[in-house]
């Protein structure tokens, strides 16, 4: 006689970008094992494959394509799936800012971690009086690379590559140039032709992009100094 099947609980959350309700379930043991083994390998390709596989399996709402979600939606979703799977309280060790060496243990409730939206954030960038650029958020692959890439590389080249993948289109009143129709070399040359002011506007897009963020207060047990620490991005909470 076959063994009975264990009922898996389901949960709902709202995607920060659209407010759309998404049903999901926790990791199963086999999926958690897959993630742990991938993280222990410190191999970015293995981690990418594992996170993609787990997110696709755990998201139950039809029509949700994980690969197309904004980075901050992916972070928020992954954090909550992990919370329902291994515990909704995260235990971290924070280095006190005042002496930069003393570690303090803290506990954070997953529900207290929000995606912060900056009012100055914009996906539209004015390059000159006639030309505009529209940016898009990093892909799932870029998200994983930024959070879990253990390989040292040329930071400048990586930055240019990231920016290039986030340019959706360049347009004016008469024409639209979609970067999907361009080569990486053409996009890179276009970026290199910008002046400093234009490039700073692109940097501002990334600096103000919605992100997981949580502010905590820590007191250094040695100096008794209380400091505020801002934790940003999934990697800060992935301990």
Language-model region placement:
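Long C-terminal interaction/binding lobes of large macromolecular proteins
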Residues: 1-239
């Amino acid at each position: 006689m076959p063994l009975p099947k264990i009922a898996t609980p389901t949960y709902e959350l709202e995607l920060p970008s659209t407010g759309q309700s998404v049903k999901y379930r926790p990791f199963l043991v086999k999926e958690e094992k897959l993630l742990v083994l991938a993280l222990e390998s410190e191999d970015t390709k293995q981690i990418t494959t594992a996170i993609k596989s787990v997110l696709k399996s755990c998201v139950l709402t039809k029509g949700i394509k994980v690969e197309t979600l904004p980075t901050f939606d992916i972070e928020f979703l992954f954090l909550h799936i992990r919370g329902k799977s291994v515990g909704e309280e995260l235990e971290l060790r924070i280095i006190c800012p005042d002496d930069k060496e003393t570690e303090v243990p803290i506990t954070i409730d997953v529900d207290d971690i929000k995606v912060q939206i900056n009012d100055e954030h914009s996906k539209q960038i004015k390059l000159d009086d006639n030309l505009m650029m529209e940016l898009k958020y990093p892909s799932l692959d870029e998200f994983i690379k930024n959070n879990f890439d253990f390989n040292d590389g040329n930071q400048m080249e990586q930055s240019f590559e990231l920016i290039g993948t986030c340019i959706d289109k360049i347009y004016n009143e008469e024409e639209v140039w979609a970067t999907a129709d361009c080569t990486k070399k053409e996009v890179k040359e276009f970026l290199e032709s910008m002046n400093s002011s234009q490039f700073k506007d692109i940097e501002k897009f990334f600096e103000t992009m919605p992100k997981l963020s949580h502010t905590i207060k820590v007191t250094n047990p040695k100096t008794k100094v209380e400091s505020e620490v801002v934790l940003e991005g999934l990697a800060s909470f992935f301990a």
